[in-house]
A protein has these predicted regions:
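Extracellular/periplasm-exposed beta-strand and loop segments of Gram-negative cell-envelope proteins
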Residues: 41-46, 78-111, 144-172, 203-212, ...
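N-terminal signal peptide c-region/cleavage motif recognized by signal peptidases
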Residues: 15-19
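Sequence/structural signature of outer-membrane beta-barrel proteins
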Residues: 35-41, 76-78, 121-125, 144, ...
Length: 244
């Protein structure tokens, strides 16, 4: 579903902008960004809706050629992994601390990814600003795991090496496709990016054994999908060159 939607948006925007392309001006910039992400594939069996914060360093040439590098930190609080820590729960579905009392455990999603992107910037003919549609594809690395936080309680079952038996650490190659609107204003601090992103992570579990389910999925291939809505502030390095 995500791939069909992304392909439709990509083709529609391409058809609308090819005839409206102007020569662009070269520009390098960095961009802090936020992405709201909807999981798909194997990722949706483990996590729900989540977010990422990232930073992009990029350059676009006069012919519209785009090159960028990205790093993103992923986080979320909707963990849906089946059987997670089931062996640690009491008959009342509580985890008991070393003090013999019910403990408070915050279960969260954590992860990161980084990639190298290539693409094309197409400027609009009717735009008085240096703005247009940006298409990119990229490749890189993605990793995610489950994090257990229990600062107020002592739970040795979820500390150190024991935690590795529950955290479902997975990582591997990622591919990405992006389509968005890159806008450079004549006004200072008025530049931004809005877009859609599809990430395909071809990952594998890196833990030998899951203590809670008494199973091993070490080396099993996963297809982790993330469909994202991305927004970012764009900071050019030499903005005065855009409108000389």
């Amino acid at each position: 579903m995500f791939k069909k939607l992304f392909l439709f948006l990509f083709i529609s925007s391409l058809a609308a902008s090819v005839s409206a392309q102007l020569k662009s001006k070269a520009q390098s910039f960095f961009s802090p960004r936020y992405t709201f992400q909807i999981p798909g594939g194997d990722m949706s069996d483990r996590f729900g809706l989540n977010s990422s914060l990232g930073l992009t360093f990029a350059t676009k040439k006069e012919n519209g050629t785009y090159f960028g590098v990205n790093g993103n930190y992923q986080f979320g609080s909707d963990v849906q992994e089946a059987g997670l820590i089931q062996n640690l729960l009491s008959v009342n579905n509580e985890i008991i601390s070393v003090e013999g009392k019910p403990a408070s455990v915050l279960i969260q999603q954590r992860g990161f990814n980084f990639s190298v992107d290539f693409g094309k910037f197409m400027r609009f003919t009717n735009s008085k600003n240096e703005s247009g549609i940006l298409f990119t594809i990229g490749t890189g690395f993605i990793q995610h795991n489950i994090r257990f936080e229990h600062q107020l309680d002592d739970i040795p079952q979820l500390d150190g090496e024991y935690e590795k038996g529950y955290d479902r650490l997975s990582n591997g190659l990622m591919l990405s496709q992006n389509i968005g609107w890159l806008f450079f204003s004549k006004k200072r601090f008025g530049d931004f990016y809005l877009g859609l992103e599809l990430i395909e992570g071809i990952t594998s579990s890196r833990r030998e054994y899951n203590f809670d389910t008494l199973t091993s999925d070490l080396g099993d291939t996963r297809l982790d999908l993330l469909f994202g809505i991305k927004a970012g502030w764009v900071v050019p390095f030499y903005k005065k060159n855009l409108y000389d």
